[in-house]
A protein has these predicted regions:
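Outer-membrane beta-barrel proteins and related beta-barrel translocases across Gram-negative bacteria
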Residues: 1-215
Length: 215
């Protein structure tokens, strides 16, 4: 796949950022190990950043051409149990990522990580860099449904482990650390009229909540 976009931004009358970003991706089809049901997917991603800045901290005043790459292996193991009135699904999953190149400094960016975006390739919402370093994202999804009453319970947990701290990753996400927060969520539909959503993050010492919210 190929995608390209560009921008020319003027801030504070004298700060200029010009960029053209080209993204290439190659994904190999899932390989299913039928004996155990393990699904694997391997992706190779390339980013070509052409940039020029004036009075800007991230981009130099002379034209720059940068090439970045990212390798990712995703695996999950769906486990399903069915009864007459209920279904139970348990999915352990992980993502291994490696970026041999550096990234732009986004340490001060505002970004909240949760169970909905922690496995996203661009989980920081940035377009000029891939996430730097080695990381392993580990998670588990559980879902149970009552087929006759249309009620269900969904639970998700995930965390990120890396080999060393990364100074340019948004610090408020905690993913810059060797061990990130533990992210979790619950979606509980008691009936057609009552539904409870709960999201939370526990710090990497597991002794306090970084955030929690009910929806």
């Amino acid at each position: 796949n190929f995608a390209s976009k560009g921008s020319n931004i003027l801030d504070n009358t004298n700060n200029i950022k010009s960029r053209i970003i080209n993204d290439f991706s190659f994904n190999f089809n899932d390989k299913i190990f039928e004996n155990i049901g393990l699904r694997n997917n391997f992706g190779i991603y390339f980013k070509n950043l052409n940039s020029l800045g004036k009075n800007d901290e991230k981009y130099k005043s002379s034209p720059q051409l940068e090439l970045q790459s990212l390798l990712e292996l995703r695996s999950d193991l769906p486990l399903i149990k069915l009864t007459e009135n209920t279904s139970h699904t348990l999915i352990p999953k992980f993502s291994l990522r490696f970026n041999p190149s550096d990234m732009k400094d986004h340490s001060g960016d505002e970004r909240r990580i949760n169970t909905d975006n922690v496995f996203d390739l661009n989980r920081f919402g940035i377009d000029d860099s891939f996430e730097s370093g080695y990381s392993a994202t580990v998670g588990i999804d559980y879902n149970t449904k009552n087929l006759s009453e249309e009620s269900y319970l969904e639970l998700k947990l995930a965390t990120v482990i890396r080999d060393s701290e990364e100074s340019k990753i948004p610090t408020k996400t905690s993913l810059n650390k060797k061990n990130s927060n533990l992210f979790g969520s619950m979606d509980y539909k008691i009936s057609k009229l009552i539904n409870i959503d709960y999201d939370f993050a526990i710090d990497n010492n597991y002794d306090k909540f970084e955030y929690n919210s009910f929806g």
